[in-house]
Amino acid sequence: MPYGDSFQKDVEEAEDIAHTLGIHSETIDISPSVDAFYSRYPTKKRVLIGNKMARERMSILYDFSARQNALILGTSNKTELLLGYGTIHGDMACAINPIGDLYKTQVWQLGGHLGVPANILNKAPTAGLWDGQTDEDDLGLSYNEIDKILLQLIDKKKSRDELISSGFAKKKVDKIINMIKNSEFKRRMPPIAKLSEITAGNDIPCPYDQDK
């Protein structure tokens, strides 16, 4: 779902992979709908436009999922989810996420194991929000650096001080910790103001739990 002509190479590579795997694909240009909105409500903030593009793409995916009685597979990895590096109700929206517990570097390893073409694995990661945008430029750190810190911080439950004393740069550790804290809302369902004894989502058990 490209915007304009900026991502033509990405489109061609995606179509090549779909063809190789025998997967039906459709290319939908989101330019008309995005441009229509910003022609009325103009902005120069690239983040706003990028988020709009991500949500436009997800809106189209959900429409197709309803038409085909299908589930949307998420593509956010553990690194992106922990850092909140994604658009809420945009590329972070899905019904099931098969790679959400794999760090970015692990996704690369899995891709190599599965035979994903080198030109895809070696591409600079980008959300495709604007021409020339890359993940690592946005984050200010490489995924290799980030994942090494996250592995110690999350999986091995090391403290901030332990990470710094073991040789990780204080500035980088603090940046990652702050990103995790500031994006917690993206990893949770919206809180509900509790006004009754039984609150939907909080106190009502799933049907298969009611007999336990």
Protein language model features and the residues they cover:
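Short secondary-structure transition/capping segments
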Residues: 11, 38-41, 85-86, 131-135, ...
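Conserved active-site and cofactor/substrate-binding residues in soluble primary-metabolism enzymes
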Residues: 9-12, 32, 56-59, 102-106, ...
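Peripheral terminal appendages
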Residues: 92, 133-212
